Amino acid sequence: MEATLITPFNSYRTHVGFGAAGQVLAISENTVFKGPILLDNPAPSQREIMEDAMKSIENEKTMHRMLQRHAHPNIIHSILVLPEGIFLERLGMSLAERLTPTALPVDPGLEVRWIQQLVSAVEWLEGLGIAHGDLRPSNILLDNSQNLKIIDFDCAVKFGGELIAGGAPFSKMNDGFKSPPAGVETEVFAIGSCVYNIHFGHEPWSELNEVDGHEVAKKWCRHEYLPPGGDEIGVIIQRCWDGEFKSIRALDTVVKTLRSDGMVARRPSWLQAWFLLVDCRYFLAKDGLSMNKSLGARLRFLGWWGTHRCLSVAVKVERGFMIW
């Protein structure tokens, strides 16, 4: 029999994304679910992929449990961590999608805002002793206010650990295509490449990479970096690639001197977070996955009540229209 993809829910959910380890399903307009890629009737080689996927998602679940206690406005909000996977807030397009050649030009103030938010989030992880390990525009999403949020923590490791993900231009490589241990050096290098992508709208060596990707990889191993220009942001990129910053906090201090558009990202309010949680619990109750029958009944009632009155009123509260 042919292998088929398994989803963890009884009701069918629309897939909104796939990664090396995970599948992402739309739960509602505001929430998504990320779980491991699992197959029914897998081939022997696919079993190994499934085992790696489950390990990666377990690692990500560990990271999100920690981030629930140490939240940051520019790191994706995890709503609920379960044995099956992780419920997360649903965001918009990725930074990679926003920076495609056909997209609208990025305002300089917004560009600086993204740079500052990216560095702030990674500096926060530094304080927790964690390296994201796979910083790249495709692992960064934008909310409705164009604020940046880092996602995908399945490759995150403690400082000093071995990097799981790799590859130029977002992973620093030395001779033999080997990356140094995870830490300030690797994270700052990845930030430099992300900032280059934000500033110029494409990856470093992008045109040459399409012709000879192996030659480009060798250039990165030899530390032959494409000159990023002499403006303020270009200087920061070069310093990131050259490893001049001894901490991400030091880099954060420098990027804060740049002039952004002044917009500030905020974590979900307690009311927003509560309704995101209700959204997930209500879905689980409808899907028959709630382990507490009385809780499930209450959530079904809450969902019905919310559909008819509570949620609409609460949205008005959140928008400042009324209090109840």
Residue ranges and their predicted role:
Residues 3-69:
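ATP-binding glycine-rich loop module of kinase domains
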Residues 64, 119-122, 195, 237:
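Hydrophobic core positions within the conserved protein kinase catalytic domain
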Residues 68, 74-112:
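Conserved structural core of kinase catalytic domains
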Residues 109-124:
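Conserved alphaE helix
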Residues 122-143:
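Catalytic-loop of the protein kinase fold
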Residues 147-149, 154-246, 250:
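C-lobe/activation-segment region of protein kinase-like
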Residues 242-266:
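Terminal C-lobe "cap" of eukaryotic-type protein kinase domains
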Residues 265-324:
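Regulatory extensions appended to serine/threonine kinase catalytic cores
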